[in-house]
UniProtKB/Swiss-Prot annotation:
Binding site for NAD(+): 29-57, 99, 138
UniProt cross-link Glycyl lysine isopeptide (Lys-Gly) (interchain with G-Cter in SUMO2), position: 57
Protein name: L-lactate dehydrogenase A chain
HAMAP family to which the protein is assigned, alphabetical: Lactate_dehydrog
Lineage: Eukaryota, Metazoa, Chordata, Craniata, Vertebrata
Gene: Ldha
Length: 332
């Protein structure tokens, strides 16, 4: 007796269902799921895989997303704690790790998360040896270094989400001050994602008009309008959100989907993201920091050389020294 399906559909072709644009998200906490929904809403993948160690939570999140399939254009959403589910991913996004507690610095998390990475990274490499790795877990600059070391991947394929979000926060706050949409407010926050990030005031502009040319004191203590408060708000904002709601999720999820779009569509847009910066700005260690990078299908193909003031360069170097001080003590 022919099944209903056989009566309805005549098959013309035995297909092997290999994904062409698969994305994996490791970690289905608030950040991982914000990344997942943002990626789904942007139609970036033909398959989305989720991995976590908490099996019930993982299955529940997968089912919840699958039930939204009618409203999405990603035909396959899968999950497992077994990394075989991640096979043949183009992009693997790592959000797993210990969460930052209220008042805890991102650097404090480091050894807890290194131990988690020692398990995750080799599994990713085993099943997707040609993928790009996008690290989101904090402290992101150090963990991007850790992922690079453990994976053995070339540095172009190991990317930290870095200051993409810090710069987005900066542009939003700048826009709020000026009454202009963030897209039309340009400014870059570079260096460490977190407390020692560096705002590049010389490049801050609207429509190519440098704000520093109008206010030479911009970003200094002498500035009557105290624009450096904008950068202070960027640094404090995550702590404030964590204090208010327990964690941050939506903005980082959107920021990660923005990076995923540049990679999956080979856009070659410039983003402030964490890359191996050895040889730039007088930095001689294997340190990952955010600088403007051209991002496309091969990951980070080029770095834009930003002209920094001596003070900005010194701050970048100090960040690098801080990070290296922690990195050289790590056990892995």
């Amino acid at each position: 007796m022919a099944t209903l399906k056989d009566q309805l559909i005549v098959n013309l072709l035995k297909e092997e269902q290999a994904p062409q644009n698969k994305i994996t998200v490791v970690g289905v906490g608030a950040v991982g799921m914000a990344c997942a929904i943002s990626i789904l809403m942007k139609d970036l993948a033909d398959e989305l895989a989720l991995v976590d160690v908490m099996e019930d939570k993982l299955k529940g999140e997968m089912m919840d997303l699958q039930h939204g399939s009618l409203f999405l254009k990603t035909p396959k959403i899968v999950s497992s704690k077994d990394y075989c589910v991640t096979a043949n991913s183009k992009l693997v996004i790592i959000t797993a790790g210990a969460r930052q507690q209220e008042g805890e610095s991102r650097l404090n998390l480091v050894q807890r998360n290194v131990n988690i990475f020692k398990f995750i990274i080799p599994n990713i490499v085993k099943y997707s040896p040609h993928c790009k790795l996008l690290i989101v877990s904090n402290p992101v600059d150090i963990l991007t270094y850790v992922a690079w070391k453990i994976s053995g991947f070339p540095k172009n394929r190991v990317i930290g989400s870095g200051c993409n979000l810090d710069s987005a926060r900066f542009r939003y706050l700048m826009g709020e001050r000026l009454g202009v949409h963030a897209l039309s407010c340009h400014g870059w926050v570079l260096g460490e994602h977190g407390d020692s990030s560096v705002p590049v005031w010389s490049g801050v502009n609207v429509a190519g008009v440098s704000l520093k040319s109008l206010n030479p004191e911009l970003g200094t203590d002498a500035d009557k309008e105290q624009w450096k408060e904008v950068h202070k708000q960027v640094v404090d904002s995550a702590y404030e959100v964590i204090k208010l709601k327990g964690y941050t999720s939506w903005a980082i999820g959107l920021s990660v989907a923005d990076l995923a779009e540049s990679i999956m569509k080979n856009l070659r847009r410039v983003h402030p993201i964490s890359t191996m910066i050895k040889g730039l700005y007088g930095i001689n260690e294997d340190v990952f920091l955010s600088v403007p990078c051209i991002l496309g299908q091969n990951g980070i193909s080029d770095v834009v050389k930003v002209t920094l003031t001596p003070e900005e360069e010194a701050r970048l170097k100090k960040s690098a020294d801080t990070l290296w001080g922690i990195q050289k003590e790590l056990q892995f």
